Amino acid sequence: MRKLILALILGIATANGATAQTRSDLRDSLSAAVQVLAFHPDSLELRMKKAAWNIELEQWRYAQEEYDFVLRCDEKNIAALFYRAYVNERQGRYKFARLDYENLLRIVPGHFEAMLGLALLNQKDNRPTEAFNQINTLVAQHPNNAVAYAARGGIEVERKMYTPAEYDFTRAIELDPKNSDYRLNRANVRLLAGRKKEAREDLDAMVGFGVPRANLIEWYKKCR
């Protein structure tokens, strides 16, 4: 679930100006960015774009180096801090990721994505009390944000807190009724709680929204 929420919130491709492409296309785009950057090595905009392609190709170290350069020139660059935190987390550099999130929050108190990223990072880094306090604060500050509820639900599932997790996924669904990820996660919670009929209802709803039934075959098998 954590990976799902990070993908939803970080929106790496969209936020960095990248679009869905094949790996070959991505490598071509990266190569072009490198060539242009060679003529404009001080361009922070170009370095941010190159880092976007590095992220798309999961070249975490190269992306980090670009964000390092940008932040040496502009230490309050919000986007660079945010994405470097993500890149640091992907490399297992949790201490550095935490510092980036915390620095970002000092610059922009209440920054939604940074607060969420920090809560999920602390959950992953075995800091359960901090993580839960942070995600509860996020939900309290954003009571109409579906992602906040879904993120808390994901943390609760990891802790086997299935009743509150179902509540949070239900709230997320109420706020974003056609989000298939939220419904699938609620179906999972219901299966974990032994409520197969209700889990199947969530799967049926997803099919009704256009998700191919064939994509859910394994989930339907669990509901038998």
Region annotations inferred by a language model:
Residues 4-14:
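Sec-dependent N-terminal signal peptides
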Residues 18-21:
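Boundary of Sec targeting at the N-terminus
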Residues 23-32, 57-69, 90-103, 125-137, ...:
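Structural signature of tandem alpha-helical TPR/SEL1-like repeats
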Residues 24-29, 192-224:
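Terminal, low-structured helical/coil segments at or just beyond the last alpha-helical repeat
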Residues 44-45, 78-79, 112-113, 146-147, ...:
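Helix-start (N-cap) detector for alpha-helical repeat units in TPR-like alpha-solenoids
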Residues 55, 82-89, 123, 150, ...:
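Position-specific recognition of the canonical hydrophobic site in helix A of tetratricopeptide repeat
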